[in-house]
């Protein structure tokens, strides 16, 4: 049968959700301006670097900064010429070419130099300031060496070196090299005892020829006259020296007759003579 009625509306099938894509516009103008500024910045940086390099070359090549004078300060034992020789600074060297730390290290190779500092004074001068070591005592190891106030062993004694310092004996060389704490503590005590003797008027550092160190008995001093042992023990040195000074004027003329002096008895000084013991209150 033929349908002659009005045509049916055809349903349109809708394909899934479609979103209209927005076309992206590239900001060429902005990019071009950014690129231009970047190029200009790089060019400026390049010019700065070039100018700096040129200026650096001019500084190193200029005669204006060549070393003309070297001033040496605070040297007493070591002469100026010896310090200049150690520095190995060639005349006419550009002041900017010098490695000041390396120059200081070369100067410090001398055992008498504790430290050296080098600084520039523009345009053409250097200043070298040194701190020298001062012997406090002589320590007996495999050989005799100078010892400074900080306990640093710094120089083996040679012909012509001064010998008028107290000698510290009883130090184990290997233990000292290894930094043994007990050995370092002993040396420190000996140096502190020398400090207490320094400046005294009755029994002073000039009355002492040697300090013998021992783990068990502590420190024993030996007098310059007669080589009499003075037993000081491990501590309380100041009060012991005070007691000793009260009777030392009486003993000084008889040191050749004394076997030993012991300060380790509380509030007493024991003096052993050949004939027996003389007890002195202090």
UniProtKB/Swiss-Prot annotation:
Major location category of this protein: membrane
Encoding gene (name): ftsQ
Listed transmembrane segments: 31-51
Protein name: Cell division protein FtsQ
Biological processes per GO annotation: cell septum assembly; FtsZ-dependent cytokinesis
Location relative to the cell: Cell inner membrane
Pfam short name (any one): FtsQ_DivIB_C
Superkingdom per UniProt: Bacteria
Keywords of the record: Cell cycle, Cell division, Cell inner membrane, Cell membrane, Membrane, Transmembrane, Transmembrane helix
One GO CC annotation: cell division site
């Amino acid at each position: 049968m033929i349908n002659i009625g009005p045509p049916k509306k055809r349903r349109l099938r809708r394909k899934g959700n479609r979103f209209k894509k927005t076309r992206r516009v590239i900001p060429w103008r902005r990019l071009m301006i950014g690129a231009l500024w970047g190029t200009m910045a790089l060019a400026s940086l390049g010019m700065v670097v070039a100018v700096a390099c040129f200026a650096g070359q001019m500084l190193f090549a200029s005669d204006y900064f060549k070393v003309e004078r070297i001033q040496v300060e605070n040297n007493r034992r070591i002469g100026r010429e010896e310090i200049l020789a150690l520095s190995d600074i060639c005349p006419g060297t550009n002041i900017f070419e010098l490695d000041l730390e390396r120059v200081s290290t070369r100067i410090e190779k001398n055992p008498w130099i504790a430290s050296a500092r080098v600084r520039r004074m523009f345009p053409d001068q250097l200043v070298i300031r040194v701190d020298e070591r001062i012997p406090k005592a002589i320590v007996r190891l495999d050989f005799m060496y100078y010892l400074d106030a900080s306990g640093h062993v710094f120089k083996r004694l040679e012909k012509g070196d001064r010998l008028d310092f107290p000698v510290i004996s009883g130090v184990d060389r290997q233990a000292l090299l290894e930094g043994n704490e007990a050995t370092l503590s002993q040396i420190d005590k000996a140096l502190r005892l020398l400090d207490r003797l320094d400046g005294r008027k009755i029994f002073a550092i000039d009355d002492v020829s040697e300090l013998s160190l021992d783990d068990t008995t502590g420190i024993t001093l030996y007098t310059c006259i007669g080589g009499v042992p003075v037993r000081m023990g491990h501590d309380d040195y100041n009060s012991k020296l005070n007691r000793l000074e009260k009777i030392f004027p009486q003993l000084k003329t008889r040191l050749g007759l004394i076997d030993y002096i012991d300060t380790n008895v509380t509030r007493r000084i024991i003096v052993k003579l050949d004939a027996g013991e003389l007890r002195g209150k202090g």
